[in-house]
């Protein structure tokens, strides 16, 4: 039996709100794009070092964002609405921040994307927009660049990617003749490319975030889960996939679908939820990451109680990771 420490997402604003301050200066044209990128690099470096210094075995990358992780995914898969006039192979800062904040220039006069709450947190995300003939294309190197950036500094990280089921489910359609999840087959080839590149770069583990799975889903959606996860695992090749859920308990049927899939691990929020049938984990050859530290408050945990929890779960789980209930930015 092995026990490891797993970080599923680290705060990005900086201990002195460095990112917020740099962004405000950038938007006022008081600093350059290069200055903003330098600030981001320093924050990421400090975050990785902090995790290493505190004994984290699985340090994460691609959890940093200049705005929010859903907007980053919009850019990653190239689902930029036509009104933003994106024509280049890769999404520029100009287009990125036009979607985030709107643009009132001679060349581009558009409102921002709609914003709504990220599940039941105080954080918000920009809502993806999908048309019936939506095309997807790899349009950002962000996860690859950040993995390489960490590697050059001596950190072997676990890249985090927002999963396709959550990404589509959080979006809205331009008309009512189709559902966003209908675009799954169109989207998956881009995920194949993303996971293949990360595999070639040497990622041992890749974290796929699918928090939408904690929400009540209909039978048609539930049928997609195992099939989709199996495809993602196939795309990743020799890299291992840990499917990460948080904010609530998984429905027992959805939990069963995940455990029967080909992914190598699963993260569960055990602050707001619990494992449906812990005895079922005895013969499961998967890594189980247990979110026993509350990721949604700043208070210290009762260490003795947490040790008791870990010892209890270790009786049933061969490969056990300890983590926070959700990413720490919440």
Map each language-model feature to its residues:
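Domain-level signal for soluble alpha/beta catalytic cores
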Residues: 1-330
């Amino acid at each position: 039996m092995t026990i490891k420490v797993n970080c599923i997402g680290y705060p990005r604003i900086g201990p002195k709100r460095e990112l917020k301050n740099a962004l405000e200066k950038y938007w006022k044209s008081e600093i350059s794009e290069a200055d903003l990128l330098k600030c981001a690099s320093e924050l990421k470096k400090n975050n990785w070092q902090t995790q290493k210094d505190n004994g984290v075995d699985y340090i994460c990358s691609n959890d940093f964002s200049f705005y929010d992780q859903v907007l980053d995914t919009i850019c990653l898969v190239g689902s930029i609405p036509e009104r933003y006039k994106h024509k280049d192979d890769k999404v520029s800062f100009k287009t990125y921040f036009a979607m985030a904040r709107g643009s009132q220039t001679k060349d581009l006069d558009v409102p921002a994307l709609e914003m709504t709450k990220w599940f039941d947190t105080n954080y918000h995300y920009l809502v993806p927009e999908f048309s019936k003939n939506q095309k997807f294309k790899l349009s950002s190197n962000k996860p690859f660049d950040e993995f390489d950036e960490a590697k050059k500094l001596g950190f072997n990280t676990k890249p985090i990617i927002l999963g396709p089921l959550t990404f589509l489910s959080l979006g809205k359609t331009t008309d009512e003749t189709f559902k966003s999840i209908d675009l799954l087959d169109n989207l998956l080839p881009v995920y194949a490319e993303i996971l293949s590149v990360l595999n070639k770069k040497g990622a041992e583990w890749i974290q796929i975030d699918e928090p939408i799975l904690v929400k009540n889903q209909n039978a048609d959606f539930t049928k997609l889960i195992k099939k989709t996860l199996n495809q993602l695992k196939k795309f990743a090749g020799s890299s291992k996939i840990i499917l990460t859920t948080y904010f609530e308990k998984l429905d027992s049927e959805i939990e069963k679908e995940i455990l029967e899939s080909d992914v190598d691990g699963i993260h569960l929020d055990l602050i707001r939820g619990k494992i449906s049938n812990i005895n079922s984990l005895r013969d499961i050859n998967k890594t189980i990451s247990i979110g026993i530290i509350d990721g949604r408050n700043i208070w210290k945990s009762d260490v003795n109680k947490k040790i008791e929890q870990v010892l209890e779960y270790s009786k049933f789980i061969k490969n056990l990771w300890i983590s926070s209930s959700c990413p720490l930015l919440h």
